[in-house]
Amino acid sequence: MTFEPRSWLFVPADSEKKIAKAIESEADAVIFDLEDSVAPAQKAAARQCLKALGKRSGGPQWWVRINPLGSEHHKDDLEVIAKADVHGIVLPKAEGGADVTELAHRTGNIPVHAIV
């Protein structure tokens, strides 16, 4: 049986303090947001925060909301996710099934939730 989160807590990925607090929350899943909640000048710092997380040890599922396909930040987001201990990816501004399929091919078996 697969566990499906009921509560999803979005947290800006550029704040170590907010990330730590979110991980300690009672949410079923924490979504580390690299997209709209992070200013363009802070995107690299946000990716560094994700790299510093290390491995999960219980608690909520970890998901990452990446920048949209085709954006200037998308490729860098995927490089961080490839090395992170995450349950899945949240894909914003998806334009259809082809976007989800493309992302799935790039990331292997990592689940994708699309925001259309």
Where do the model's predicted regions map?
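Conserved alpha/beta-domain cores
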Residues: 2-116
